[in-house]
Amino acid sequence: GAGPAQLRTLLRRISGVDAVLAEIGALGAEVRYRRVLGAVAELEALAVGGAALGERISGFLSRDDTVVARMAAALDMAGDMAGEVAGETAPGDPSGHLARAVRWQRYSRASGSDLHRACGADIARGSLRLWSQACATLPGERPVEREDPA
């Protein structure tokens, strides 16, 4: 006899529930990404209005965390339009971020739709931030020695 875990696995496989859940997630990804773009556009419009508030909003929109969050939303949408993207970069390999940035920048320039151009640009921008955070160098270059701030 099969144990409870094996039975659950078998039922999930037979029912196709995982495929249904994946499809629902993919369909929602574009809606979520459009909402992110809409919120960013509203914040950018508010930033134009006031000096102090505008600086705070601009600072928020340009923070690494915000840029990477936009990239994550774009990657969710890109998973549906460009195949599986989660495995694009090897964990712990900063050069993978640079390669992904180049690939998605090219994609954004070649795309015919505004949505896909924005998506590619957000992925490229976020990938460059992650690459920069990892203190990566260009292929063939030696890493720059950083001074210890202590």
Enumerate the predicted regions with their spans.
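Non-catalytic alpha-helical scaffolds
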Residues: 1-150
